[in-house]
């Protein structure tokens, strides 16, 4: 089967476009738009898609015909997910649970991949619902300790 270079390159190109667009969206305070970028990014990392606890393997290989179709009819570059495949079933399931909660702006893998963690951007009034959904639909069914960490962002790096 070999190394699937096409899907990895497409992921990288899409990530560059999403990074550029993400900065613009944050400056415009367009959090829903930024959240969609987080979802597209995770779709490029994912290996599985979950619905009601059931997993489906994601096949994001790109044939010549797929690439020609993307060029001719495809969505904008920021929506091209490619396939980096650095997620795992556990992170994919957590991401899908989080993204299904009303008030979750966008969730996806962050960190090293094949481990890492899921970061969810959530409206303040939906935090409790998201934590409960993750506990109820992921941690408890897998007999795992409940392990959500709620944080608030700051302005970022600055000179003190």
Predicted regions located by residue number:
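Small/polar glycine-rich anion-binding or flexible loop at a beta-alpha turn
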Residues: 111-118
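C-terminal nucleotide
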Residues: 1-108, 120-160
């Amino acid at each position: 089967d070999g190394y699937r270079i096409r899907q990895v390159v497409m992921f990288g190109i899409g990530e560059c476009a999403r990074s550029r667009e993400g900065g613009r969206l944050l400056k415009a305070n367009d959090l829903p738009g930024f959240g969609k970028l987080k979802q597209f990014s995770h779709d490029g990392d994912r290996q599985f898609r979950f619905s009601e606890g059931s997993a489906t393997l994601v096949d994001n290989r790109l044939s010549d015909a797929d690439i020609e179709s993307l060029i001719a009819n495809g969505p904008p570059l920021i929506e091209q997910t490619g396939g980096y495949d650095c997620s795992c079933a556990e992170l994919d399931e957590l991401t899908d649970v989080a993204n299904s909660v009303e008030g979750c702006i966008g969730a996806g893998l962050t960190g090293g991949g094949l481990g890492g963690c899921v970061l969810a951007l959530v409206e303040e009034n939906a935090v409790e619902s998201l934590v409960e959904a993750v506990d109820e639909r992921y941690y408890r069914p897998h007999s795992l300790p409940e392990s959500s960490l709620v944080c608030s962002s700051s302005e970022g790096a600055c000179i003190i």
